[in-house]
């Protein structure tokens, strides 16, 4: 028989996972989005097309972590051409949410400074799945896989997959 997979995604990776789950429902047993991104509220998004013509890169985003012991390895600069393409892809992923029918687990922090918490509600409420859960991990910021709540994130992800395998 065909193998089905669980997709576990972080940040922009969630847009990729949502797109895949919408396009290939027969291949996806479940979807986990961690600090998932389908909405960008930053007003600079309206100028992404112009910005990419003016400068090749902008400062990157890193270390949105509450844990003083935590650290994230990230790029110092972010290419503006990639940012424009990312915005276009995110719009498409958001439009594809109603075609996602697999079990869904959404985890996010109300204290995320990188991806607005409204994204969690947009994902949770936007999918067609009847089997869906939203967990807030508010002792952390954006990188919830490395932050204070990381063990809760790992355990919840494990249980979600185990209970649906």
PLM segments and residue spans:
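Catalytic histidine neighborhood in serine/cysteine hydrolases
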Residues: 121, 125-143
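Active-site nucleophile loop of the alpha/beta-hydrolase fold
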Residues: 32-42
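Catalytic active-site module of serine/aspartate enzymes centered on a nucleophile-bearing elbow/loop
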Residues: 138-165
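Gly/Ala-rich beta-loop-alpha elbow adjacent to hydrolase catalytic centers
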Residues: 9-13, 17
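Residue in the alpha/beta-hydrolase core beta-strand immediately N-terminal to the catalytic nucleophile
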Residues: 6, 29-32, 98
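Conserved alpha/beta-hydrolase "acid-adjacent" motif
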Residues: 113-119
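Short beta-strand/loop motif that positions the catalytic acidic residue
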Residues: 99-100, 106-108, 112
């Amino acid at each position: 028989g065909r193998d089905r997979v669980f997709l576990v995604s972080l940040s922009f990776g969630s847009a990729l996972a949502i797109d895949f789950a919408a396009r290939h429902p027969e291949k996806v047993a479940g979807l986990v989005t961690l600090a998932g991104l389908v909405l960008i509220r930053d007003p600079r998004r309206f100028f992404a097309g112009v910005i990419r013509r003016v400068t090749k890169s902008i400062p990157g985003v890193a270390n949105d972590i509450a844990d003083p012991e935590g650290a994230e390895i990230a790029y110092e600069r972010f290419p503006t051409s990639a940012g424009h393409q990312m915005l276009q892809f995110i719009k498409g992923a958001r439009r594809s949410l109603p075609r996602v029918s697999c079990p869904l687990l959404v985890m996010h922090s109300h204290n995320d400074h990188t991806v607005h918490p409204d994204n969690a509600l947009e994902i949770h409420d936007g999918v067609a799945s009847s089997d869906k859960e939203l967990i807030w991990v508010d002792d952390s910021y954006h990188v919830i896989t490395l932050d204070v709540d990381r063990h809760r994130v790992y355990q919840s992800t494990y249980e979600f997959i185990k209970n649906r395998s």
